[in-house]
Amino acid sequence: MNEMENTDPVLQDDLVSKYERELSTEQEEDTPVILTQLNEDGTTSNYFDKRKLKIAPRSTLQFKVGPPFELVRDYCPVVESHTGRTLDLRIIPRIDRGFDHIDEEWVGYKRNYFTLVSTFETANCDLDTFLKSSFDLLVEDSSVESRLRVQYFAIKIKAKNDDDDTEINLVQHTAKRDKGPQFCPSVCPLVPSPLPKHQIIREASNVRNITKMKKYDSTFYLHRDHVNYEEYGVDSLLFSYPEDSIQKVARYERVQFASSISVKKPSQQNKHFSLHVILGAVVDPDTFHGENPGIPYDELALKNGSKGMFVYLQEMKTPPLIIRGRSPSNYASSQRITVRTPSSVNSSQNSTKRKMPSMAQPLNESCLNARPSKRRSKVALGAPNSGASISPIKSRQSTPMEASKENEDPFFRPNKRVETLEHIQNKLGALKNQCPDSSLKYPSSSSRGMEGCLEKEDLVYSSSFSVNMKQIELKPARSFEHENIFKVGSLAFKKINELPHENYDITIEKKSMEQNYLRPEIGSRSECKTSYGNELSLSNISFSILPNSAENFHLETALFPATEEDVPRTFSRILETGSFQNYYQKMDAENADRVYSKGVKLIASGTLPSGIFNREELFEEDSFYKY
């Protein structure tokens, strides 16, 4: 309480301001990433923070209406040749992509494309009358008025530095996304037309399909070869345009500011640029002397190889534009507060932030001085000075009883899902020490009340955290695998890697061997086939194992000599380095009951070797056999 009363009110105000700024930042983050605004023509534009959202270059979300244009001045009047009526001209430009309105400034990026479209209109003359008429420029030269015949009207764009009024180069790219070709935006011949809506420009921006292009053909082009020539005179303006397909809309797409502008340092004072749209008339250079300094003009190189003069009629420009030379992530908005504490502290201090004005209890300064993070951490950070470790594995929530039990159990490991042998031994050893009468078994119900003993739920061992002792499989010292047993005909062979000890009692494994031998016969695999005679009529069979054989089988040769009728047969399946031969012999009936000390006798055709071997019939060495 004394510490709360001695808290400095100035420090309290600082802490309150920090949390207020943090709260405003969180509210700012909760605002929609993409803001939709209604344009004057009824279409919509999508505005978003490029530091938060990355959009593909060809995405329609990149299209948004940019800064408005303002009139610079009118230069030279245009009159109709026969009537002398002055033509009322007006440029209608619009930026459809590339600029964002940030902090009351229009901001663009040097490496990003921008799209500018423009048309012009004649308020006192419709399109049909405009194309059938001819027009002249009124040029005053030394108080003498002269007229220059207009060949056609056109529009061009350029950029200027507002600080020193120098012209900045613009670069336009083709539709192919490669390094070239690059060229300066050209002069675009136009006829009067209304400006298409922003949505149409957005939809037609990346159209390359011929069928879809025909949909917008009437919007963007006037085809001279589709009109009736009889309605137009020889000196009409329609025939003076350079091409049959005359554009109605000047579309400057995929335009960038040239890399020569120096805007690489975000810390330096922002340079302002402006885009200019100029409507002009192309006239014959032989008739234009250029003596009037008040009328600007540019020389043109026409497609037919001749030259032309582009005389300025009207000019419009944008408000000052900030062109940034680096990516949006390098520029921080002045309205954005970056002070932020870790997300875990935010979640743990929610109640404190709501009651901050009353300052019921002092705040932990170490939490407030935490380093601001650029993004919210996905790992929950523990409270300061807390010794409890948080498991990275998500599990079900524990009840209060289970939580207290976990704290009491000295062997509880919340972040281990499988019991190890060492942990089992430690747990059983602890139970044995606490319950000496129970030996190595679970404690009785009377001993479970003892502090430190496991509850009933722990004795069963949850399958999600441990392994039940009853589920541990105890295997014999020697196991005979099924894969080492081969059944060929009426014989079953088992491959062993080494001989058992001479004192080893094979009867221990007799039952398991008999069960293993009762496996189905191996299909018709070619490597398991053997060629043998009609062994069903034979009483005895003997095998000779090569001395260099690395495989040992419990088989011995018969004591009787082989006859001339013995036919050797060879197994087609060879196990590693082992080779085997069997000899089928025909025996007389009187020899059927003869007892051989070390012979192998077949009782019936289906008898397995496991039913014939005796306990004492074992090899002493790998290469020593008794005959």
UniProtKB/Swiss-Prot annotation:
Bias (Polar residues) ranges: 327-351, 386-401
Induction, as annotated: Induced during prophase I of meiosis. Requires protein kinase IME2 for initial expression and continued transcription during meiotic divisions. Can autoactivate its own synthesis.
Effect caused by changing residue 254 to A: Reduces DNA-binding by 93% and abolishes sporulation
Effect of residue 97 to A: Reduces DNA-binding by 67%
Pfam family name, one: NDT80_PhoG
GO CC field: nuclear chromosome
Outcome of substituting residue 113 to A: Reduces DNA-binding by 80% and abolishes sporulation
Effect of residue 177 to A: Reduces DNA-binding by 96% and abolishes sporulation
Consequence recorded when altering residue 110 to A: No effect on DNA-binding but strongly reduces progress through meiosis and sporulation
Region (Disordered): 324-410
One GO process term, biological-process aspect: cell division
GO molecular function term, any single one: sequence-specific DNA binding
Annotated region of DNA binding: 28-335
Localization (cell): Nucleus
Keywords annotated in UniProt: Cell cycle, Cell division, DNA-binding, Meiosis, Nucleus, Phosphoprotein, Transcription, Transcription regulation
Domain of life of the organism encoding this protein: Eukaryota
Posttranslational mods: Phosphorylated by pachytene checkpoint kinase IME2, but also phosphorylated in an IME2-independent manner. Phosphorylation probably eliminates SUM1-mediated repression and is also required for full transcriptional activation activity. Phosphorylation of the DNA-binding domain by IME2 does not alter DNA binding affinity.
Effect recorded for residue 54 to A: Reduces DNA-binding by 50%
PROSITE patterns for this protein: NDT80 (PS51517)
Marked site positions, Interaction with DNA: 58, 111, 177, 208, 254, 326
Protein function: Transcription factor required for successful completion of meiosis and spore formation. Gets activated after completion of meiotic recombination at the end of prophase I. Recognizes and binds to the middle sporulation element (MSE) 5'-C[AG]CAAA[AT]-3' in the promoter region of stage-specific genes that are required for progression through meiosis and sporulation. Competes for binding to MSE with the transcriptional repressor SUM1, which represses middle sporulation-specific genes during mitosis and early sporulation.
Description of how the protein assembles with itself and partners: Binds to DNA as a monomer.
Listed name of the protein: Meiosis-specific transcription factor NDT80
